[in-house]
């Protein structure tokens, strides 16, 4: 539902791929899979037949001050869902589950470098999101 997810969804559908979205709210049709990473809920059977899972989730990093509790929320919002997906995928892998999991979150790997141009070969930053 985020910026990257919506762009990826549009691109995949334009290419002719069938995409099912994972949502936390009640599903509206067969194009959606209900899950709740906070409660550890995901029916692994819903993943059977998929080629891949793309996980682009996490609490926004610019929404609040980075208090200790907000940092914990940011970290948990990324790790909890990924753990649930990895567990569910391991259950369905032998019976036709996805063989690929792509997971991405945050944009802080390089840290705040001001106006310095950053590339894939740039050194990692320091600090909370860079570690």
Regions found by a protein language model. Give the residues of each.
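Alpha-helical "lid/cap" subdomains adjacent to substrate-binding clefts that gate access
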Residues: 78, 127-131
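A general structural motif
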Residues: 16, 50, 96-98
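Short amphipathic alpha-helical segments and helix-helix/interface helices
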Residues: 9-13, 44, 86
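Conserved Rossmann-fold NAD(P)-dependent oxidoreductase catalytic core, especially the SDR/UDP-sugar
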Residues: 71, 83-127
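Conserved glycine-rich Rossmann-like NAD(P)H-binding loop of the short-chain dehydrogenase/reductase
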Residues: 17-24
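NAD(P)H-binding glycine-rich loop region in Rossmannoid oxidoreductase-like domains
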Residues: 27, 31-84
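SDR active-site strand-loop-helix element
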Residues: 22, 53-57, 101-107
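N-terminal Rossmann NAD(P)H-binding glycine-rich loop of SDR-like oxidoreductase domains
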Residues: 1-15
């Amino acid at each position: 539902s985020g910026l990257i997810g919506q762009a990826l969804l549009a691109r995949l559908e334009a290419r002719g791929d069938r995409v099912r979205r994972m949502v936390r709210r009640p599903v509206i049709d067969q194009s959606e899979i209900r899950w709740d990473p906070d409660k550890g809920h995901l029916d692994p059977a819903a993943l059977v037949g998929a080629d891949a899972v793309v996980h682009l989730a996490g609490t926004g990093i610019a929404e609040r001050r980075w208090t200790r509790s907000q940092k914990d929320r940011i970290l948990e919002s990324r790790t909890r869902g990924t753990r649930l997906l990895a567990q569910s995928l391991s259950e369905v892998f032998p019976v036709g589950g996805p063989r690929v999991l792509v997971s991405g979150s945050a944009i802080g790997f390089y840290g705040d470098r001001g106006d310095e141009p950053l590339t894939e070969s740039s050194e990692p930053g320091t600090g909370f999101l860079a570690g």
